[in-house]
Curated annotation (Swiss-Prot):
UniProt source species: Mus musculus (Mouse)
Sequence ranges of Polar residues compositional bias: 55-64
Residues the record lists as binding mRNA: 165-166
Name of protein: mRNA cap guanine-N(7) methyltransferase
Recorded GO CC terms: fibrillar center; mRNA cap methyltransferase RNMT:RAMAC complex; mRNA capping enzyme complex; nucleoplasm; nucleus; receptor complex
One annotated GO biological process: 7-methylguanosine mRNA capping
Main location: nucleus
Molecular functions per Gene Ontology: mRNA 5'-cap (guanine-N7-)-methyltransferase activity; RNA binding
Motif (Nuclear localization signal): 113-115
Subcellular compartments: Nucleus
Length: 465
């Protein structure tokens, strides 16, 4: 990483090099002759998906042996408590992969010609039942997650990984709110889509917004989110805090506009963190999610979020000898290789103590194309590595990384031990120390944690005038 100070942050030599995606996968517009969203020819898009994956896979094979990932920012981790309470059940998706240098070519994609379902009433009854079953499973999973205090979270194996993801979100949210303030200084309204237990409430307070609508499928999570909000208000009697409403709904099947207290409400920002991929079970659900996210945005408003990178997931899957990959922190299991439909491409994801629920692959060029229906333009899409490398150059962002304990101290303090006991999980930090003249300690993520978080990307769309 670049920056005035130096530190080793998860410089994983086996993790995939960033910035090698083909144009269609890197957040750029699709070819101008691509049909409108509602008229997208699915077999054609499916073919483009396959071609993109093959190109992506080839570029990684060429680059991975010679490129060493080095995240270098020198951080001394001193605080014992994170300034930003991210929430124990925020949708932190994480994947990884010990990827070999000789990756097999991708299998043939399913080219079955079938039309996109334009309306809910055209979805076969059997499919509707399957979707209802999956939605119930997602809601049940997040409802069953227990609230965990700060002391307990600090003992978690993924404590730093979750803080790192939380830092990514903090920077993303903060910068987008600053963009909004360039055109309006008051009455900023936000929709938090898939808000979970309210892990981003503190971010919205710090962002000095005026009004927040939280929506999530899990009713117990929503009650906990509302309680967090009430607790926040009680702790800050003399400080203005945004008004809020809380909606329990499946945001991929129900229209939120029908549930708003104010049916004429519009938003400046919609944030969907680690959640939009659940909607890609079907075209109808993905479109409903986008309608909720973008349909009520003001001109110049933003749809922001984080989601798994489909190219990285498939790359690691194809490099695996089985239908699954992962490490001691997380696992991802697909049903089979070589068949990656645009919708309903399910995989099972497990993250230590946080997530254990089916998810769906999001082909980002398709998401970009579908968003055009709501007059949305992609303004950027970056991997977590690319986002980190860019934002860590700012000293304020660097200090926030420290305050949030988003990196682990290496070497460990004499009275403590490293988060991972796995052999080789800190070789990147040890090697960096040998090669660099830096003062100790360093801030880093273990190799296992970096393998998990490095499959994610950050995105931002803007509502056109």
């Amino acid at each position: 990483m670049e920056g005035s100070a130096k530190a080793s942050v998860a410089s994983d030599p086996e993790s995939p090099p960033g910035g090698n995606e083909p144009a269609a996968a890197s957040g750029q517009r699709l070819p101008e002759n691509t049909p409108p969203c509602q008229q997208v020819d699915q077999p054609k898009m499916q073919k483009e998906f396959g071609e993109d994956l093959v190109e992506q896979n080839s570029s990684y094979v060429q680059d991975s042996p010679s490129k060493k990932r080095k995240l270098d920012v020198e951080i001394i981790l001193e605080e014992k408590h994170s300034e930003d309470d991210g929430g124990s059940a925020k949708r932190s998706k994480l994947e990884r992969g010990d990827v070999s240098e000789d990756e097999p070519s991708l299998g043939r994609l399913n080219q079955t010609k079938r039309k996109l379902q334009p309306q809910d009433d055209e979805v076969p009854q059997k499919l509707q039942k399957l979707e209802e079953g999956h939605s119930s499973a997602v809601a049940a999973h997040y409802n069953e997650l227990q609230e965990v205090g700060l002391a307990k979270r600090s003992q978690s194996r993924i404590f730093y990984l979750r803080n790192f993801n939380n830092w990514i979100k903090s920077i993303l949210i903060g910068e987008i709110l600053e963009k909004v303030r360039q055109r309006k200084t008051r009455d900023i309204t936000v929709l938090d889509l898939g808000c979970g237990k309210g892990g981003d409430l503190l971010k919205w307070r710090k962002g000095r917004i005026s009004r927040l609508v939280c929506a999530d499928i899990a009713d117990i999570s929503m009650k906990q989110c509302q309680q967090r909000y009430e607790d926040m208000r009680c702790r800050r009697d003399n400080e203005h805090i945004f008004s809020a409403e809380f909606i329990t709904a499946d945001c991929s099947k129900e229209l939120l506009v029908e549930k708003f207290r104010d049916p004429e409400m519009y938003f400046d920002v919609c944030s969907c963190q680690f959640a939009c991929h659940y909607s890609f079970e079907s075209q109808v659900q993905a479109d409903t999610m986008l309608r909720n996210a973008c349909g009520r945005l003001n001109p110049g408003g933003y749809f922001i979020g984080t989601t798994p990178n489909s190219f990285e997931l498939i790359r690691r899957l194809e490099a695996s000898e089985t239908e699954s990959f992962g490490n001691e922190i997380y696992t991802v299991k697909f049903q089979k290789k070589g068949n990656y439909p645009l919708f309903g491409c399910k995989y099972d994801f497990n993250l230590e103590g946080v997530v254990d629920v089916p998810e769906f692959l999001v082909y980002f060029p398709l998401l970009t194309e579908m968003a055009k229906k709501y007059n949305m333009k992609l303004i950027y899409k970056k991997t977590f590595l690319e986002f980190y490398e860019e934002k860590i150059k700012n000293n304020e962002n660097k200090m926030l990384l420290k305050r949030m304990q988003a990196l682990e101290q290496y070497p460990a303090h004499e009275n403590s031990k490293l988060a991972s006991e796995k052999v080789g999980d800190y070789t990147h930090a040890a090697e960096y120390l040998k090669k660099s003249q830096v003062r100790l300690p360093l801030g880093t993520l273990s190799k296992s944690e970096w393998e998990a978080t490095s499959i994610y990307l950050v995105f931002a769309f803007e509502k056109q005038q």
